[in-house]
Design a protein with these regions (language model features):
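Bacterial N-terminal signal peptides that target proteins for export
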Residues: 5-21
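Active-site-adjacent loops and short helices of periplasmic peptidoglycan-processing enzymes
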Residues: 34-200
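Bacterial N-terminal signal peptides
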Residues: 20-29
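Domain-terminus/edge residues, biased toward the C-terminal soluble/receptor-binding domains
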Residues: 165, 179-391
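Serine/proline-rich low-complexity intrinsically disordered segments, especially terminal tails, linkers
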Residues: 13-14, 26, 33-35
Length: 391
């Protein structure tokens, strides 16, 4: 290897090392700013940026605790994914079993042999926190409660929720011969992140304050009071029973940024809500709206053209892209061009030739199409020969 090549390789390694150090330092600064705040009154809390996976604050977030009704988030996630993947239909009819009709706790009072669609039961599950709806959906998807619980634990493993064990589809307190569901605040945040990514349709349900059931004979009311007391909150799920304390997995959006906050084993619902509001507010204060690219901006001025009357062409960003980012990381966004290298003629102006991706710490945070700045006419035989032997 020649000296110049060695120097280039060494320079590349040093640049990557410096970038890693900068990212680590900036992340540390964020952690320190949160650490200076007082500890929360809840046993376990976490604040997550779901776009990047960054943990902005955590307190005892890796201790498995009873989630109570927050266990229903996994039930809803599995059912909605089955709908999205075509394994079941949202309009499929679910017949209520005898076991479902006898369940206690929060419910919509399903009666044996009654029939409801999956959509209706998902609404009951996420708005009223209906235990009977949770079990009815579990039986319909897997044939039995036990089969569905196995599925819940399989999904947990896929999502790398290593501090989670489910024993029920609803999170009710265990009977004497049963074990409690256990999940950490960190794992609930991972589940919320998966819901936002894979089944965002659930936000249409979790964001509803109330909704009718049985054609209006029963009005379901959401237990998540953050929906009306914290601007931008549109989910996800509360939970409570005596041994579990008060808990919530919340998400909110502000100026294009979204955060997830989890609080578990809080002494009262008021303290729970106050702690989560404080976490979300401090988190959003770190964000700013950043323009990554203008619509029509030149991304490359000389992308090579094969088989054309010209040898190169400019490519443009199709859309303006703005994202909300935590201020320390805004300058670390990288641009990556996929495609347009080369461009095959003939091609029309504004036709797509690739994608411009914006990447932060290895994760894509936004993208837009790349389009041609001009018409590309087909060239003569010489241009075609150049295309065959390399541009």
């Amino acid at each position: 290897m020649c000296l110049n090549t060695k120097l280039v390789v060494l320079s590349s390694i040093m640049n990557k090392t410096v970038l890693t150090i900068i990212i680590s330092f900036l992340t540390l600064l964020v952690s320190i700013s949160f650490a200076e705040e007082k500890r929360t009154s809840c046993q376990s809390t976490i604040l997550l940026d779901p776009a990047t996976g960054e943990v902005l604050f955590e307190q005892d977030a890796h201790t498995p605790l009873p989630p109570a009704s927050m266990a229903k988030l996994m039930t809803a996630y599995i059912v909605r994914r089955r709908v999205n993947e075509g394994q079941v239909s949202a309009g499929d009819i679910v017949r209520v079993s005898a076991e479902v009709s006898k369940i206690g706790g929060s419910q919509v009072y399903l009666k044996e042999h009654e029939e409801f669609s999956i959509t209706e039961l998902l609404e009951a599950l996420m708005i009223e926190s209906a235990n009977d709806a949770a079990l009815a959906l579990a039986e319909h998807v897997s044939g039995s409660r036990e089969g569905f619980v196995d599925l819940m634990n399989q999904e947990s493993q896929k999502l790398k929720m290593t501090e989670t064990t489910f024993f029920s589809p609803h999170g009710l307190p265990p009977a004497k011969d049963q074990k409690p569901d256990l999940i950490s605040a960190h794992d609930l945040a991972l589940l919320a992140q998966a819901i936002l990514k894979d089944t965002p349709e659930l936000l249409e349900l979790t964001g509803k304050v109330e909704a009718p059931f049985r054609a209006g004979a029963f009005v379901m009311r959401n237990h998540n009071h953050l929906l009306t007391s914290f601007p931008g909150c549109d989910g996800l799920k509360t939970g409570y029973y005596a041994q579990a304390g008060f808990g919530v997995t919340a998400t909110a959006q502000k100026n294009g940024a979204r955060l997830v906050a989890v609080a578990m084993n809080c002494p009262t619902s008021k303290i729970r809500d106050a702690e989560v509001k404080a976490l979300l507010s401090r988190g959003f204060n770190q964000f700013k709206l950043v323009k990554l690219v203008d619509r029509g901006a030149v991304v490359q001025s000389d992308s090579p053209v094969v088989g054309g009357a010209v040898s190169s062409s400019a490519i443009l960003a199709k859309d303006e892209i703005k994202v909300s980012l935590r201020e320390p990381l805004a300058s670390l966004v990288e641009k990556k061009v996929d495609g347009c290298n080369p461009i095959n003629a003939p091609a029309k102006k504004d036709s797509s030739c690739g994608v411009l991706r914006f990447v932060l710490k290895g994760k894509e945070i936004a993208k837009t199409e790349l389009v041609l700045a001009q018409d590309l006419e087909k060239g003569g035989m010489l241009s075609s020969l150049k295309g065959l032997i390399g541009y």
